[in-house]
């Protein structure tokens, strides 16, 4: 119990830092817009599959990672300064984004893919989980080439790397066809004190790689792969004691592969 309290306090501190960073960036953005008139804006949408690495399934099992999946959909807004910050404008973009993610989860791997009919195996097979996540965050993108080339007749292919910080509101649900989670009949001993249906807020950090492809003047497609590390291990509804179960070595994290469309205007 003391361990979970310490982890919760640590998560809350990290969440406050994430919120503070987002507010500072938003404040700087609004101040810059008020001071300078020469900037252009972009709006876009994105969607794609997301794969959640959680406490469901055997650690390191590829099937577990690929099948505990869902989808993500969202919108984003870019602000790029054109005239007043030439060094920044040629290499960086600043993106505000909001998204919705839904993932369904089960246990996969060697502990359920066997002929055993033990209580532990049956309990694992009967467990299911679902989590939905609403995310708001910021992302800074670095372009090796000029970010506005595709609007000036330059290369239509513009790759980038990015880093970001987000605030996530999640709702997790853990169920079993054997009965109520938390009872000995339905719950493996590993999850007796480490499974719950709950709602919460957690910060996250992300790293992305992607590219823009111009399809017409002021129109582009975006292809992006993002890894997102949550500052909580409760996003999936499971969090076995990592002092006892050494395989629980990290918080929940996800990989998303998205396709988006962006429209540019002054």
Predicted regions and their residues:
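Transmembrane beta-strands of outer-membrane beta-barrel pores
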Residues: 47-53, 98-104, 144, 165-171, ...
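Predominantly the C-terminal beta-signal and adjacent terminal strand-loop region
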Residues: 38, 54-56, 207-266
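Short glycine/proline- and aromatic-enriched beta-strand/turn motifs that initiate or cap beta-hairpins
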Residues: 34-83, 262-266
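Residue-level detector of the transmembrane beta-barrel scaffold of outer-membrane proteins
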Residues: 42-44, 93-95, 160-162, 220-222, ...
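Bacterial Sec-dependent N-terminal signal peptides
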Residues: 1-39, 46, 263-265
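Short loop/turn motifs that connect adjacent beta-strands in outer-membrane beta-barrel proteins
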Residues: 34-39, 80-92, 146-157, 215-219, ...
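Extracellular/periplasm-exposed beta-strand and loop segments of Gram-negative cell-envelope proteins
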Residues: 56-66, 103-135, 169-202, 234-256
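Residues on the lipid-exposed face of transmembrane beta-strands in outer-membrane beta-barrel proteins
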Residues: 45-49, 73-79, 138-142, 163-167, ...
């Amino acid at each position: 119990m003391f361990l979970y309290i310490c982890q919760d306090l640590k998560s809350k501190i990290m969440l406050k830092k994430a919120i503070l960073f987002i507010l500072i960036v938003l404040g700087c953005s609004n101040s810059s817009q008020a001071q300078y008139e020469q900037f252009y804006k972009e709006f876009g949408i994105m969607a794609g599959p997301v794969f959640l690495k959680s406490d469901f399934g055997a650690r390191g099992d590829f099937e577990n990672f690929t099948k505990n999946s869902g989808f993500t959909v969202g919108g984003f807004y870019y602000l790029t300064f054109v005239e007043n910050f030439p060094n920044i404008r040629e290499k960086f973009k600043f993106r505000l984004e909001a998204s919705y993610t839904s993932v369904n989860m089960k246990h996969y791997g060697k502990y359920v893919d066997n002929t055993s009919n033990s209580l532990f195996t049956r309990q694992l097979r009967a467990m299911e989980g679902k989590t939905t996540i609403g995310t708001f965050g910021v992302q800074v993108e670095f372009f090796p080439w000029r970010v506005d080339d595709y609007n000036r007749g330059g290369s239509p292919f513009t790759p980038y790397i990015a880093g970001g910080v987000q605030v996530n509101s999640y709702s997790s649900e853990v169920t079993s066809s054997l009965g109520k989670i938390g009872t000995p009949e339905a719950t493996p001993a590993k999850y007796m004190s480490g499974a719950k249906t709950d709602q919460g807020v957690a910060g996250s950090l992300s790293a992305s790689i992607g590219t823009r492809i111009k399809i017409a003047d002021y129109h582009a497609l975006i292809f992006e792969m993002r890894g997102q590390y949550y500052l909580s291990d409760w996003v999936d509804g499971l969090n076995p004691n990592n002092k006892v179960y050494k395989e629980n070595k990290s918080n929940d994290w996800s990989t998303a592969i998205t396709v988006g469309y962006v429209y540019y205007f002054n």
